[in-house]
């Protein structure tokens, strides 16, 4: 087999080059791979078109809204890699529930701001832009690393009580404060939870059409493929501005893990879903869990959908799940047209 020419495109919140180089150094990787970093999506497509690259790995969020450009270049997504660090981190001396009244927390994600307001009433949750305008200060940032370093200085100076940062960026800058991971699973049923942003830390791999599947499977992961296909099916037609209003979690689960969680939460519906009338387990395959939610700006209202599907059925089941999700949203807006803006 000829040496594979592999390109990567990275952003601070999804350093694809680091992820892929770590994989290439592992025993699971192919031996003959030559990797190089690229500066833009268009450059990567051009390199693929010209035959200078065989494959291109990019953050999935960059591909959103650009799939027509990809198809016109004679390329397609051949697979994806499972997110390693999709959850966000709250940097603060206090856990969220112990924040003082009127504490100031910064986050540049509309979703995260709504989730924080839902979880803790009485705190001020602002974007960096709003904080700058309110305090009439002048700040410009070259990149995300510089922006989060500025937030850390504000926290150390006592001007804010905390800020929310992607886990991977937290590891790249010097932060000495306590950290609290915003997890998607509540400790107890009904407790606070924080679904990740769509495409969070998800890497997709693009190749020319008819690229050998046998090679593609060696570089992609089944769970990553599932996450990409489901999120793309639900969100592919949405405007980019609306993506940040949605929390979306897709993952593979073992039945035993789900049953333990259902027993802990006394969730009889989940316990009975995969057992027959005699109490026997009806499936032994991997399950696909889908959680999606949309929250009003003030955090007081949440619309959500939760499905657990056998892996062999998920590509059919997501068709009805996506229709149900659209109906739920439409019904909510019919009842209250200002649902999201409250």
Feature annotation, model-predicted:
Residues 1-46, 113-114, 118-342:
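Small-molecule-sensing regulatory modules
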